[in-house]
Regions:
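Alpha-helical oligomerization segments
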Residues: 214-282
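A short acidic-to-branched-hydrophobic micro-motif
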Residues: 179-198
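Surface-exposed beta-loop interaction hotspot
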Residues: 105-179
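Secondary-structure transition/turn motif
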Residues: 78-86, 189-192, 233-235
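Short acidic, Pro/Gly- and aromatic-enriched capping/linker segments at domain boundaries
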Residues: 200-219
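N-terminal membrane-targeting/anchoring modules of bacterial envelope and secretion proteins
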Residues: 11-139
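A short, cysteine/histidine-rich metal-binding "knuckle" motif
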Residues: 1-13
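Long, contiguous binding/interaction regions
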Residues: 37, 163, 279-282
Length: 282
């Protein structure tokens, strides 16, 4: 779309750092969530000019491969891979291009920087991500009678690390998870950072950041140019009771964003507190 072209200028393949690499893709927040928050998930992708080819986006692939091609020709693109250049979208697009011409049953191994070329925004048909969460990584070897020892070992390690995660239905890119005895909600917000921080500060002062009960807002982290607020939840909360409070909070945020005004001294202090509790993930 126009926004990502305006943000990133002519050099689609140069290695300048791109703050919001997924801007311009439908469901930018879901891309960020799958890269930073969700352990095991897939979503089908459609490549322009190869609409009949089965392509699946996956959070993680065996041995942290950037991409692989199953024996039946299905391409898997791994999202949680180490960035090589300054533009995550270009890195992923380069891996996808390699996978589309790779032999069935092979994996893509990155070599050096990808160099100039198309980004995901250029390769993919515009369509929202239809995310499927998985309890583990068995989808790697679905239909494979005897996965190799290396892949099997990688699968066992990955399965052991999976954090129980559920996606909320009422708003995009909001994910409940349980880590040991603790539960959290992490919610990737699509709004531009500066006005969003103002709105969050206003809600914080008005006690409007709660989700009811003993849920506690604990801060936010920045990922790929978007803010991800995090709430600490009492054990046993689960995802379902969060649906209504999260939709109510989204409405309060929308109201605050729609009526910007200078912050009061108290709100400015609250905004500084929000910033001091930020952590940036790339």
């Amino acid at each position: 779309g126009k926004r990502y072209k305006a943000c990133h200028g002519r050099g689609a393949g140069d290695q300048a750092f791109v703050t919001r690499p997924f801007a311009g893709l439908p469901g930018e927040t879901e891309w960020v969530a799958l890269r930073e928050v969700v352990p095991a998930a897939t979503a089908p992708l459609t490549v322009r000019g190869a609409e009949d080819r089965a392509v699946l986006l996956a959070t993680v692939l065996p041995l942290a491969w950037p991409a692989m091609v199953r024996a039946d020709g299905t391409v898997f693109l791994g999202l949680q891979v180490q960035g090589r250049g300054g533009d995550v979208s270009r890195d992923l697009a380069a891996a996808l291009e390699q996978a589309l011409v790779a032999a069935p049953g092979s994996s893509v191994t990155p070599v050096g920087l990808p160099g100039p070329g198309p980004r995901l925004q250029d390769l993919l048909v515009d369509a929202p991500l239809e995310v499927t969460l998985h309890p583990g990584f068995g989808f790697w070897v679905e239909g494979v009678p005897d996965p190799s020892g290396e892949v099997r070992a990688s699968l066992e390690r990955a399965d052991a690390s999976v954090v129980p995660t559920e996606r909320l239905d009422g708003v995009p890119a909001a994910y409940w998870c349980r880590m040991g005895e603790r539960e959290h909600l992490r919610w990737v917000l699509p709004d531009d950072e500066e006005p969003l921080l103002d709105a969050l500060a206003r809600l914080a002062v008005a006690d409007g950041l709660g989700l009811g009960g003993d849920a506690r807002y604990i801060g936010c982290f920045r990922a790929h140019g978007l803010l991800v607020p995090v709430w600490d939840l009492p054990g046993g909360t689960g995802a379902a009771p969060l649906e209504e409070p999260v939709q109510t909070l989204r409405a309060r945020l929308d109201d605050a964003l729609a009526a910007p005004r200078p912050l009061t001294a108290e709100e400015r202090r609250a905004r500084s507190g929000l910033l001091s509790r930020q952590l940036t993930l790339r």
